[in-house]
Amino acid sequence: KPPNVWRGSPAEDLCDLDDIVEPVVFYTGAAREAARDYAKNANVAATVALAGLGFEKTEVELCADPSISSNVHDVTVEGAAGTFRFEIAARPFPDNPKTSMLAAFSIVRALANRTTALVV
């Protein structure tokens, strides 16, 4: 994510967000700590952990990247059958750049799914 969205998080103590000129990985570890310490920024990591191996076995890297304007999530799944990788580059929500516009759409879909017989 862009450096400005990490303001108000522990990332401010780990790197100088104002002077970053190239991507800086400031957290590498389990999804549990990422979700706890970066609650406003690591919801995709938490979602992947819930859908996959759990919070302890899901590995997370958090990065401040001054070259991007989107909230980018790079997900890699490795297993005996092979490797699967995909990237989400979502535009930040105008009122809260720490989250993406996709988050609002996900909430709308979740509410719609509660009122329909067919869930997509």
Predicted regions and their residues:
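Active-site-lining helix/loop region of Rossmann-like oxidoreductase modules
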Residues: 1-120
